[in-house]
A protein has these predicted regions:
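Extracytoplasmic low-complexity segments
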Residues: 14, 117-179, 183-193
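Bacterial N-terminal signal peptides
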Residues: 1-9
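Alpha-mannosidase-like glycoside hydrolase catalytic domains involved in N-glycan trimming
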Residues: 14-142
Length: 193
């Protein structure tokens, strides 16, 4: 478990983000006050789920679907995928690829928003890279698409569809004997029987 602390709006952003009106810092804490990872622990290219809530993020300052949101660490852009952005309901779920997480450390992650001139850069393929072992990633909300470049999208069987439900980290699908989701693995992988 990682601990993220969001610290409101900061006026300073790296030069790359000068055109963004707002920025804030979140801290990934792996010391004993947070995830309590040993100093020897190192995790590479970790997809970190960041949740935004109206209690600490003003959705009216960003574009309606979060298209102007960006993440960075030490001035370098971070790949991200917006899984859900509900400005009206006041919550969002964004996966951010963290290049390196070290144990017994505190790492700042900056979020930038408030730039009407930019279009969205949300890209699941850059967060969940197949070259790093992700064969498929399904967030299992209303959308059953694979977030990886393998495009192993899920398809509900018409006679036995899955149903939406609430999961541990957000929207989910309910499975069972009469609730089946098909994923065509044979399109990408050789299946040997």
């Amino acid at each position: 478990m990682f601990v993220l602390v969001f610290v409101g709006c900061l006026s300073q952003a790296s030069a790359q983000y000068d055109d963004w009106k707002h920025s804030g810092s979140m801290y990934l804490v792996t010391t004993s006050a947070g995830a309590n990872l040993p100093a020897s622990a190192v995790e590479k290219n970790f997809p970190l789920l960041i949740r935004l809530n109206k209690d600490y993020f003003d959705f009216s300052q960003a574009k309606p679907r979060g298209e102007d949101v960006r993440f960075s660490s030490n001035g370098k852009p971070l790949a991200y995928q917006i899984e859900r952005w509900d400005a009206e309901g006041g919550n969002a779920a964004v996966w951010v690829r963290i290049p390196t997480i070290k144990g017994n450390d505190q790492q700042a992650i900056q979020m930038h928003w408030g730039n009407e001139k930019v279009s969205g850069e949300s890209n699941g393929e850059q967060v969940f890279r197949t070259t790093e072992g992700f064969a498929g990633v399904w967030h299992l909300g209303d959308n059953l698409e694979d977030a990886t470049s393998n495009n192993l999208d899920g398809v509900n069987r018409p006679d036995k569809p899955t149903t939406n439900t609430t999961g541990i980290i957000g929207d989910a699908q309910e499975f069972g004997v009469n609730k089946i989701l098909d994923i065509r693995l044979t399109d990408v992988y050789d299946i040997i029987s």
